[in-house]
Every structure is written in structure tokens, then in C-alpha cells.
A protein has these predicted regions:
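Helical "lid/coupling" subdomains associated with nucleotide-phosphate turnover
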Residues: 1-121
Length: 121
């Protein structure tokens, strides 16, 4: 398991619950591991994400609010409104960026807005 050699962030929304269960089965280092996701996953009462993590193992859960509710774009606001579930590692990618760079949520949000505008026009 990679977690025995380096720090690992599992990123991909609720799908990572299955990965965590598999990691526990094959053996991993929980101290070197965390699940990274957006606040949309953690705050989703239907997903019961934190409760399920606790049932599987004692592992850190890192979450971030990408502030998409402030977006000028309906497509991005849909995430904050609960209409879209990412499941693509967005939260983990944001967390990794915050940990490894001098980015802030505000800087990243501005980049999200810029890129969304670029690809949608």
C-alpha cells in the first residue's frame, strides 16, 4: 500500500468509501492517509459520509468549501445547490493545491470562474 511509504489523500467523493474499505482489508497506514472531499459531500445528509467513514475506520477526513455558491455560472452553482455530485476528486485536488502551493480558496475560485467561462463560450 502506498500509505506505508508516503502520505495519501483518497479523493473522489463517496466512491472513496469503497476504496477505504478495500484499503483496510489489504492493509494500509491510517496515520498516513486521509480522505479529501468538498463540503458538499460532508454536508450531504443523504450520503451519511462521516458516519460511514467512522464505521469503516478511524481516518482523517479533510473537506473544503470551494465557494461555488458565489459563482456567476449556473453550472457551477449547481454543485453548491446539491444538483451535481462531483465524484471526480475535486475536493482532494483543491486540498492538495492548498497544501502544496500558496493558493487560497479565493484564488482557486477565481480560476474556476475563469476556466468555466473559457470552456463554456
Amino acid at each position: 500500500s502506498a500509505s506505508k511509504h508516503c502520505r495519501v489523500i483518497l479523493a473522489g467523493g463517496t466512491q472513496m468509501l469503497a476504496v477505504l474499505q478495500l484499503a483496510k482489508y489489504i492493509g494500509y497506514d491510517a496515520e498516513n492517509s486521509a480522505i479529501g472531499c468538498t463540503s458538499y459531500i460532508v454536508d450531504d445528509s443523504q450520503a451519511k459520509f462521516l458516519e460511514t467513514v467512522e464505521q469503516i475506520d478511524n481516518i482523517a477526513v479533510l473537506s473544503c468549501d470551494p465557494c461555488l455558491h458565489n459563482s456567476q455560472h449556473f453550472g457551477l452553482r449547481s454543485y453548491a445547490d446539491g444538483f451535481v455530485k462531483e465524484g471526480a476528486g475535486a475536493g482532494g485536488a483543491i486540498i492538495a493545491s492548498l497544501l502544496k502551493t500558496e493558493n487560497s480558496i479565493e484564488k482557486l475560485f477565481a480560476l474556476f470562474e475563469q476556466e468555466y467561462k473559457r470552456i463554456s463560450t
